[in-house]
Amino acid sequence: MTKILLTGFEPFLDYKLNPTMQIVENLDGEKIENYHIIGRILSVDFQQSAEQLKRHIEEIEPQIIISLGLAGGRFKITPERIAINIKDGEPDNNGYSPVDESIQEEGADAYLTNLPIRHMINRLQEEGYPAEISNTAGTYLCNNIMYEGLVYAQQHEGVRAGFIHIPASFELAIQHGKIPGWHIRDLIAAVKLCIEETVRAGNH
């Protein structure tokens, strides 16, 4: 059976929980057509998370890599178009805060996703979920992991990879107090629709 690697992150900064964990844990083991979803949670650590992703890829040998990240403050599901070869941001969970560093010293400046992001947002909107394409994944861990996934996809013909930012869950929004949120079941359903569109694009 063909495999999908679906990743999320542990809590970070002032977010006491991370709904990507709940989404990944809920969808882990699900089957969509001839694809099997395998979920993994990554550390919020610039060094460790990239190595973890590489180990998971080596173990699973996925044809599709979809990574999820929390975008606290956004109200829409936002598939990302591009990852850039820069890491620069607030401290990770081990206190490391890179400034103007390359993800890969000899790497390309940027990679465009090869996920069907236009089909994703069209499907989400048809189903009543707010969605739009994002043209920046930032320079924090989300961009870092998207870039690493796309490096693998570039090196392995037929592999598709990309990143989807999600809003907060209601639970997190209530805890935080200043960001919008969705019901966790809607976040799970929306991500599943994105996976379905990716599978459909690969089968046609």
Swiss-Prot record:
EC nos: 3.4.19.3
One Pfam match: Peptidase_C15
InterPro entries: Peptidase_C15 (IPR000816), Peptidase_C15-like (IPR016125), Peptidase_C15-like_sf (IPR036440), PGP-I_bact-type (IPR029762), PGPEP1_Glu_AS (IPR033693)
Major location category of this protein: cytoplasm
Keyword Protease: yes
UniProt superkingdom: Bacteria
Subcellular compartments: Cytoplasm
Active site: 80, 142, 165
UniProt xrefs under PROSITE patterns: PYRASE_GLU (PS01333)
Protein known as: Pyrrolidone-carboxylate peptidase
Gene assigned in the entry: pcp
